[in-house]
Amino acid sequence: MMLGLESLPDPMETWEIIETIGKGTYGKVYKVANKRDGSLAAVKVLDPVSDMDEEIEAEYNILQFLPSHPNVVKFYGMFYKADRCVGGQLWLVLELCNGGSVTELVKGLLRCGKRLDEAVISYILYGALLGLQHLHCHRIIHRDVKGNNILLTTEGGVKLVDFGVSAQLTSTRLRRNTSVGTPFWMAPEVIACEQQYDSSYDARCDVWSLGITAIELGDGDPPLFEMHPVKMLFKIPRNPPPTLLHPDSWCEEFNHFISQCLIKDFEKRPSVTHLLDHPFIKGTQGKVLCLQKQLAKVLQDQKHRNPVAKTRHERMHTGRPHRVEDAGKCCLEDDLVNLEVLDEDTIIYWLQKRYADALIYTYVGDILIALNPFQNLSIYSPQFSRLYHGVKRSSNPPHIFASADNAYQCLVTFSKDQCIVISGESGSGKTESAHLIVQHLTFLGKADNQTLRQKILQVNSLVEAFGNARTAINDNSSRFGKYLEMMFTPTGAVMGARISEYLLEKSRVIQQAAGEKNFHIFYYIYAGLYHQKKLAEFRLPEEKPPRYIAGETERVMQDITSKESYRTQFEAIQHCFKIIGFADKEVHSVYRILAGILNIGSIEFAAISSQHQTDKSEVPNPEALENAACVLCISSEELQEALTSHCVVTRGETIVRANTVDRAEDVRDAMSKALYGRLFSWIVNRINTLLQPDKNICSAEDRMNVGILDIFGFEDFQRNSFEQLCINIANEQIQYYFNQHVFALEQMEYKNEGVDAVLVQYEDNRPLLDMFLQKPLGLLALLDEESRFPQGTDQTLVDKFEDNLRCKFFWRPKGVELCFGIQHYAGPVLYDASGVLEKNRDTLPADVVVVLRTSENKLLQQLFSIPLTKTGNLAQTRAKITASSRSLPPHFSAGRAKVDTLEVIRHPEETTNMKRQTMASYFRYSLMDLLSKMVVGQPHFIRCIKPNDDRKALQFSQDRVLAQLRSTGILETVSIRRQGYSHRIFFEEFVKRYYYLAFRAHQTPPANKESCVAILEKSRLDHWVLGKTKVFLKYYHVEQLNLLLREVMGRVVMLQAYTKGWLGARRYKRAKEKREKGAITIQSAWRGYDARRKLKQRSRRRSESEAHIHTVLQTTPDQKYCPDSGGESNRGHEETSRNCPAEADTDGHPQAQSPPTGCDVTSGHADTAAGYTVAELSVAGTDVSPSLVYHTASAHQRLSPCEDSLKPGSEEGLSQKQRAPRRRCQQPKMLSSPEDTMYYNQLNGTLEYQGSQRKPRKLGQIKVLDGEDQYYKCLSPGACAPEETHSVHPFFFSSSPREDPFAQH
């Protein structure tokens, strides 16, 4: 949120709450008084919850910067009341409108048998239009115009309020595309934005809302107000524009005004400015004051009557879940178990009534019935995902998102795998339902990895492009079984996915029935390559389509290249490959293999005669053979040899035999089926590799799964073959699984636990499954047995069925040789046995395998190098060795393929041995594998119903629906869900789950009946039963218990959060104190170290100086002066000066001292080794001759080894001068030459004169100095001259004016 909450003022300093006015959408509204001037206002108190931040800021910005207008509520400011416990409150202080809303006024009048006068309605609408015009002129769309947002003042003023969802338009964005508002007042174009992402709207959406408000002013409620708000989103776009309930009771202008506001095409809808010129509104403009007084009188009259309860219609927003406050509004017909009368006619009536209202979902207890609407509905947007997130099921209408949410909540709450079983006939909507479940589970399990979520959402689209096709009854029929497992962490975050595929209908690649098509991907890739001008690269023709996709009409090629949907789907498939993580080389290899399959289908064969009268075959169109070989990167000669001949190994000898035309065509088609089947398995395995969970996030033991079964539905065509037999057997197995969980296991536990419950009769299909799957006399076992006989034919197969399958479920029609009938749970089906044996054998010659393993396409090599599993798919273990990387797999590297090829060429019998698995055995193992995955999870059933066979929207065929209800056991399910107990939980598990509801957290209640009773009574549940070891609950009991447990756990989490926050703050405080203490310790240590370092440096420098001084002193006694008359006396004076310091005589003149030795006068400074200067000697009164000074300096220069090399003016000399400052404790140097005496006498005279002219100081300003001060002891009246920078007066050795200090005076 951009608002700085802490910077806002505290409202308690200015405002005082007087009373509660009402309740808004997201907070209460109070009347407040200003503490300073007593003025009244209204305040809307909002909690700063994260999902309202956007609205708060939008409303604040609009109110703050919008200029004032008589028909827009005034804004006094925003305040923030801090509260650490609840997070603080925002106060929006607005103008007080004591008249209430127009909705309250109209309802109050209608309650008294009255209604608003048309003139007053016109006046209210006129004020609202002026307010909207003011907003629109400032590029603001209100987007929530309704009666509750039009307030009245006691003087009859009309004010627009509530700008929480208003939109600010800009010069570059004059439209919006967010679906937001209150459903009853939302315009059709606003609702359309949920489903149609290219839709948008402008300010005229407020005109539609105003038209609905006009109806509300007349009738008291908006149209269809009794409906659920979510249902209204279905109705508004489809229904004609609403009108008043009794249009004849109102004037024509009012009806016309409403009709103009409610034009569904907003481009033709008038604007607010145009509506101000409408006759119904224009007649008000000259009567504003009169009508205002009339409205004020009506308000005054209403004030004396009883207040009317306010009706709030919550607005809906894409960014926020919508919750219905009153759960009791849930319609009874939402759940068929609640119906008083339970029979077929009643159930069909309610299903048809709901379907007519576009309510396609209905509950049967905890089972969901979904009717295919055969149209796009706008009920699957993110807004609805938020709507069905962790709420009570009865709070919202039935929805597939509710079933997904139920499975997710059970997963997180009980840490147990879940299984969602979607079943129904072909064309009933199972695949789309699976899409929606994955979409909602991905939303619920939001992970930090956004890429992973996008990958999972793309998986279904990619797999269905390769595994779905158009059939006679379904344009997007699944031609394989798919079990998608979504993996979650213990906290509920999605972390990966895995697909298991079963029984791909490979025979569709080579042949399709009348009115059907091949797999979608062939049309997508052909159209995509055509528009990319790449057909020639993949050796595909541009004029005549390949035989596998040619179809029956001659316009196939034109349809493929001209259909925009095919090209769009191809681009979508490319996007899926990229998002999921396929490498570009992998995708290119996939395209080459698909193109190779299409080219193989175009190869033709012709018979040729030979000398030995043996049928042979040849390829009359070598260009097709060359194209296929080129795309597959194999030799055309080897391919032709593999198609037209085969090798037989007998007693160690290899015999090459020619293939007949029919056998060559079978080999060609078998090669195409094997290529496509193995390519499909590789794509699935590759997806599993790219979506496998990260082991660092969660271990395999802690991982939880939600399985989604989307399997081909029950089929009954005009011609049913081996594929339909396998599909229907699989549906029989799913129906048996449903019966076991819903009926058999439940009633068995009634008997074992001694529970008195009504037993429901149901149709058990176990005998039929035994007829199919038992050994050795089951149908599939007999089929495998006959397939192993080389002389076996389709006729002998049917005879064997008739001889061994003697039961009521099997019959053989008379007059039809190769047919047999099966009485399935969904009805009787007649099967054609032609080609069943060959399809079951699914023979692929070893010569074809060898040729394909020599391909230069590394992916193609891999497809025929990896062995097949018992379910007929490529083994994942081998793929992990070569495809463990998430980018480009290593099998694309050079040199690796030849090793695999040579390794597997030695064992071609893996794929060609007659003892290998048949299609029936693959099918049997596939069912076993599928059931082993399903039984580990808690099941959730979704029964899809096909309302008609014509695939027309909103057309309901009672006979077709009733037949499906009977076959799936829905009627019996309603009875057992009403009378039975769908949840049976052991005492120990029940107490472990729910003991928080009745016991304290530290308590450990025993797992017995008493504890269970305490929990159930504390939860205020009824109609439960206790058995010997289990608690028997209704389907709705578990939901109520889970909601109560979630509330308790929410409070626990809140308490833990506060505690953890307090502990964290305390740890932080202690860590901060410890850190500060450590910093002080470090700083102290550093300061000590630095002080010791500096002291050590000073000590070192002193030591060096002392060493230097000792060196100089050692050379002093050996100094020799030049002969001079005063030499002896000077030495005597030297000794005297060393022994006796200078003392002042009685006259104040210092006594003379002998000059010390070692004074360097040439360097211009006092030698620190001697400790005295020549100037000090002069002050003492000793006459120092120039010759003496000269010879002394000379002697010093000769006898000072440390300065012997220094020359005046050199850098060494300069540094030496700088290193000789006067010591701090040394006495002032004194000069006493005659010239100095004269100079200082003149100076003293000047100072005395200046002192006489200066005003005397006051006594308080005079500083009394101690006569014992050390400075004054050393300083005599004749020695008050400041220290010279030179040791000896310059004229002793130089006459240069620059060096003479007196020359400046």
Curated annotation (Swiss-Prot):
Query: Protein kinase domain: which residues?
Result: 15-281
**Which stretches of sequence are listed as region Actin-binding?**
927-949
GO CC, alphabetical: cytosol; filopodium tip; myosin complex; photoreceptor inner segment; photoreceptor outer segment; stereocilium tip
* Any one of the GO BP annotations: visual perception
Location within or outside the cell: Cytoplasm, Cytoskeleton; Cell projection, Stereocilium
Q: Where is the active site?
A: 144
Protein name (database record): Myosin-IIIb
